[in-house]
Amino acid sequence: MSDLPWLTIIVILPISAGSSIPLFPHRGNNIIRWYTLGICLLEFLLMTYTFRYHFHFDDPLIQLEEDYDWIDLIDLHWRLGIDGLSIGPISLTSFVTTLATLAAWPVTRNPRLFYFLMLAMYSGQVGLFASRDILLFFLMWELELIPVYLLISMWGGKRRLYSATKFILYTAGGSIFISMGASSMGLYGFDGPTLDFEILANKYYPVVLEIVFYLGFFIAHAIKLPILPLHTWLPDTHGEAHYSTCMLLAGIPLKMGGYGLIRINMELLPHAHSLFSPWLVIVGAVQIIYAALTSLSQRNLKRRIAYSSVSHMGFVIVGIGSMADTSLNGAILQMISHGLIGAALFFLAGTSYDGIRTLFLDGIGGMAIPMSKISTMFSSFSMASLALPGMSGFVAESMVLLGIITSRKYSLTFQIVIAAIMAIGMILTPIHLLSMLRRMFYGYKFLNVLNPYLKDSGPREIFISICLFLPVIGTGTYPDLVLSLWDKKVEAIMFRSFHE
């Protein structure tokens, strides 16, 4: 069984299974829901089996490689493979998508298209993290965009068309830079065109050309992550999307930007990355404070959480730019941690809306008593988001901070200034999160209003919240459980960055 194309099966299963959804009867909403959930569970089990029995975690090299000719005219190969850097995002994608499918249970309008788009998005995301061909990477990047656009524009709020259009303009604009960079890198050189990541990683470019390549890919990944000032699509998108779509957006697409920065900008273009890394650190540190302050001024609950996400991504940017093993490990852990915590917060914001029919904090108050379960879960994940010790966010942010302080690349003055800015950001995060909790769950406004929609969490909501909370606690108490997945790969990347 080890000879089976496991990665190909994992990549194509969701979209191929989703293609059969239109064959289901029009009134078979429950059948469609259970079928989609079953496909997600099957995918998760296949992924778990493959990683458990066919992947060696102490090997930093690419494993489970598959290479098939696809389009000879442009030398495009179906080339897949994974290493420690891929395994975390793929596992996160599978886990969050399965729970988002369960979270989407109340969706009744055109569920066949809704669940097909979720499965198509699933394939695109897993395919991107498993790609070993830069053009295939671009195609998977594009495959993920259209489902997200349709999910926002068809199942969003009142301003869904504006938000969906803004999302597609930003991300499609970034895709242009990826396509240009991928084709240019593939065609450069005297030994013939190649799109293989492994070969591209060993190519050497003139300094100016490498900087041009780096900036092109950086713009695309900066939009996705997002990085200031290319972040404005994110609050609008989260503010209008259905909460199951928000779970997917918070859990995975943002991580595609961080993954791309490491996989392409850092691994394929190390010299340019070394030149730009101080600017990454500065921008990341500023982003932590700016987004935290902006979050504090938001009246809409989902927009406040969205800006909090932008602030947390600042730690990822600092970690990638720090040029230190500890910080890069922390940045990857922060992506995984935020994928879980962010998905949970948006899910709970959505379930709160189902009960109170408003997202504006000015009209919310006193929810702690009538909605005690939601209050408990929301408070728990908010503590995780503000990096409470014992939870995954604390470990990730502490590693990034420690890494920048001990980095060999920067002067002591630079390290102290950046560490001080990050520390201020870590103080601002509890301020805007605790302020949000105070306004939502305490006070008197809501208690004096008779609301026929008022309801607390049911078994489904509690189950999803517990499933997301357990890995947050597990990673916070025993971080080596996940750090061991990619620490060897991080060592290899940093060794190459300092010795080439």
Swiss-Prot record:
Keywords: Chloroplast, Membrane, NAD, NADP, Plastid, Plastoquinone, Quinone, Thylakoid, Translocase, Transmembrane, Transmembrane helix. The chain crosses the membrane at residues 4-24, 31-51, 87-107, 111-131, 134-154, 167-187, 207-227, 242-262, 274-294, 305-325, 330-350, 358-378, 386-406, 416-436, 462-482. The keyword Calcium does not apply. Pfam families: Proton_antipo_M. GO terms for biological process: ATP synthesis coupled electron transport; electron transport coupled proton transport. It is found in: Plastid, Chloroplast thylakoid membrane. It catalyses: a plastoquinone + NADH + (n+1) H(+)(in) = a plastoquinol + NAD(+) + n H(+)(out); a plastoquinone + NADPH + (n+1) H(+)(in) = a plastoquinol + NADP(+) + n H(+)(out). Its EC number is 7.1.1.-. Belongs to the complex I subunit 4 family. The keyword NADP applies. GO terms for cellular component: chloroplast thylakoid membrane. One of its GO terms (molecular function) is NADH dehydrogenase (ubiquinone) activity. It is a multi-pass membrane protein. Its main location: plastid. It comes from Cycas taitungensis. This is NAD(P)H-quinone oxidoreductase chain 4, chloroplastic.
